[in-house]
Amino acid sequence: MAIIGSKFITFEDYSNKYYKYHKQLAEFFSEKYYNLKYNDLYKYLFLDFINSSTVDDKDKIIKYVNRIEEGTVQEFIKVYTGETYLCYTLNKWLRNLNDYEYDYIKFFAGPFSYALYRYANNNRKQGIFSSKTFYRKMTIKLSDYYLYKISIGELICYPSFTSTSEMDMTKYSFPTDIAKQVNHITINDITVLLIIDYNCQNCLNLTPCICVSEYSENSDEEEYIFPPFSFFRINKITEKSGSPDDPHIIYMSTPNKKNLLEFDLKKGKTIKYNRLRNELYSS
């Protein structure tokens, strides 16, 4: 699992700026394209992308597309979970969305979202559990860590695909020197561990997290992927004062109706969230 940090966005930023992208992406988590083959969908989106784009790295994109041999869900997952162009570039674009770059998102994130949707619907294992605990260790800037601290009790979301693991990472060390070599960590960076309490029965997210360990390049990590714009509630933070290798722990959970009722109704968050979510479901 990559240990590159993910920036979250607040509910206000989501509703004011990112919601329109989420709505466009949400259609791929529906049955709209259910009868299309993966390679047909890629061909359709790719041609549209090439015809409308003015980017200079088309050759690089074409080379990436050729790695998806027949557009099977296995290949989508392997390319994403491996050390490839897709994982890093796709999430980088998703974290910095604007109207111009959405051409990329439609091409890359759309078919991958669609593949995950098909995989989840065809895999009975997705519905076996009602609740789980997921973990994600990552390195973030101190300034971003401060945003987590002031957002305790708030609803946040990640605009990128969020990889987590069912492995209890509190039992594993995370050497600072190795992390520095991999991610070029500086004195202005900090290591954190997200512990996410996931309840699929009460969860208000549009789409569930999806287990991809069966086809993942790192199957031993028991990887689960949360789709873009999945919402979480920051419950509390436990700061470690011991070894520098110990991460600060950020406790989070998937939102439910009780969480929404705790919001400041004067700001209209509960009403606005439900309205946006209903629009997504009807798209």
Residue locations for each model-derived region?
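Mono-ADP-ribosyltransferase
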Residues: 1-283
